[in-house]
């Protein structure tokens, strides 16, 4: 199945950001190639992921409600103004995480990092917002990896939200680092810290809970995490399973490939309102039809240009294999 097109209709912008601009809330998920543990939750990987998130926030300006990166997949809950902003943040975050964590000193992975492009799924109601936040927080605990969401050693928003503080990460400017090392004398060594910037990851309140005080919001998240912990403990008791734990997690190779990877299909949209859900599905189908027609018209215009022979004209593959 091909990756769905990014589509955010005006009707999906049901909330506003701090500037009063209409926004849509999107859950973004992504998985490593073959489910390999390239996102191993070391302190260094955690810091690098948080640095990418913090820098992306500063450059793009989207709202971030939650994040959770396990050993082989990551999830974000974000508020965006349109599809262009969504595309920018996905490209920036996923591209830079792959470049940093694929380096020799992290996972020594030179090939393709992600199994597919990130999957954005719109969230359309307040109830769905709370449900997706709970699901994101449960990552790591529901899999039996740790006993509480805040115990996950990797990049996870639970601890920051429960303790009412912000996470911080680092961004290494590789271009600056190479330049410094190229111009350094033999007597002076250049450290990575000379090209490192620290970033704060700002977490926003869910739009449906934006009117709560900081203390009230923190208490709701704590209660949610406590409930997740109790539910996971009951599940372990019924199945006689044990928690994997931090030490065993960190002993695993970043090249470890699990025996099974969840292949369940992603929903088209998160919406408990069946009428609204059906409206969105029909609107998406109409959008795809219009998008395909526009691509065909653009292809015709491109082929009318005087393109030198010997290469592949832009949109030639679209004409041969329509979306």
Which positions does each model-derived feature cover?
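Short catalytic/metal-binding and nucleic-acid-binding patches
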Residues: 1-323
């Amino acid at each position: 199945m091909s990756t769905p097109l990014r589509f955010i209709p005006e009707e999906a912008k049901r909330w506003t950001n701090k500037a009063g601009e209409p926004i849509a809330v999107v859950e973004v998920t992504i998985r490593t190639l073959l489910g390999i543990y390239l996102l191993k939750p070391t302190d260094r990987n955690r810091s690098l992921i948080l640095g990418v998130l913090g820098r992306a926030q500063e450059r793009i300006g989207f709202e971030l409600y939650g994040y959770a990166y396990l050993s082989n997949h990551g999830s974000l809950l974000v508020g965006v103004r349109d599809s262009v902003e969504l595309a920018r943040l996905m490209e920036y975050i996923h591209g830079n995480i792959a470049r940093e964590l694929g380096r020799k000193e992290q996972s020594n992975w030179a090939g393709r990092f992600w199994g597919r492009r990130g999957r954005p799924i719109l969230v359309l109601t307040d109830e769905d917002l709370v449900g997706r936040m709970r699901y994101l927080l449960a990552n790591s605990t529901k899999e039996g990896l740790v006993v509480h969401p805040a115990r996950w050693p990797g990049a996870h928003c639970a601890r920051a939200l429960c303790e009412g503080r912000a996470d911080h990460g680092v961004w290494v400017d590789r271009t600056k680092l190479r330049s410094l090392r190229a111009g350094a004398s033999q007597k002076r060594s250049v450290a990575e810290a000379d090209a490192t910037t620290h970033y704060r990851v700002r977490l926003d309140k869910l739009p449906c809970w934006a009117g709560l005080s900081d203390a009230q919001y923190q208490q709701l998240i704590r209660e949610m995490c406590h409930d997740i912990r109790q539910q996971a403990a009951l599940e372990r008791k019924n199945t006689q399973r044990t928690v994997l734990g931090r030490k065993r997690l960190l002993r695993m190779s970043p090249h470890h490939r699990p025996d099974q990877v969840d292949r369940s299909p992603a929903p088209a949209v998160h919406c408990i309102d069946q009428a609204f859900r059906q409206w969105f599905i029909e609107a998406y189908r109409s959008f795809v039809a219009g998008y395909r027609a526009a691509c065909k018209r653009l292809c015709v215009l491109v082929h009318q240009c005087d393109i030198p022979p010997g290469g592949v004209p832009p949109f030639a593959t679209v004409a041969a294999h329509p979306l």
